[in-house]
Amino acid sequence: LIEKYWGEFEIKDQPTFEVRKESPITEVVETEVWGPEAERLYMGFRFNGANTEDSRILTMTDMVLSNSSAGLIDLNLNQSQELIGGGCFPMIMKDYSLHGFYGSPKPGQTLEEVKDLLLSQIEEVKKGNFPDWLVGAIISDLKLSQIKKMESNSGRANEFVDAFILDIPWNEHQNEMAELEKITKQDIIDFANENYSDNNYVIVYKRTGEDTSIPKVEKPIITPVSVNREDQSDFLVSLSEEKVKDIEPVFLNF
């Protein structure tokens, strides 16, 4: 089918993808968003893109911080109820990667306090204050997730999609887990100390209140439209006068 419908298409030169060089983040970039919903914050650090050492160690660092059960944020902040629903996630893209953090305040708590709590857990990683067994457990959990993913057609298809859109050679994509297994606790500690500081992130505060920056547009005068509900076209009249035979069932003869 591919040859039949697309076989005559000529192969053209593929455009070369070039990463747009972004300036380093040297001071905190803060943004505020206002609305009636509950307050929360999102914070992000920028890293190198897919198929780099950054992206692999970022995956491990993220799991040390938050893995839904035994991460530092899970234990020290969520289970101890220091805040509401804190966590983090990696977003691996072709040009750059993002390590995002989020959290909501308890009653009487400020978003700035939530930010400080999340940053404090990064400091714990820098100091190596997480158990030695956690790195091996993370690898086991990632392997289990990979096995479950490969049990479905959609999961296997997504593996091809990820490798394609991130421009990772298939053999290297399949070897990703082996590369993750080489990462040690010290690698994670060094990575955290080199890449996370108190001034190289972007943060968005979602605050409760009225957004006064919303532009107002004057309502235009709308010209009434006559819908002519009673009028019928000649075509409608002729169509309505046509006689249609009743549908009779046709039974299969076995």
What are these regions (language model features)?
Residues 43, 53-65, 73:
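Active/ligand-binding-proximal structured segments within catalytic/core domains
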Residues 1-34, 39-40, 75, 171-254:
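Proteolytic maturation boundary segments
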Residues 1, 38-49, 74-182, 202-207, ...:
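M16 family metallopeptidases and their MPP-like homologs
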Residues 6, 65-69, 119-126:
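Short amphipathic alpha-helical signal-transduction/dimerization elements
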Residues 2-8, 21-25, 47-48, 60-65, ...:
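A broad, low-specificity signal for short, low-complexity segments enriched in glycine/proline
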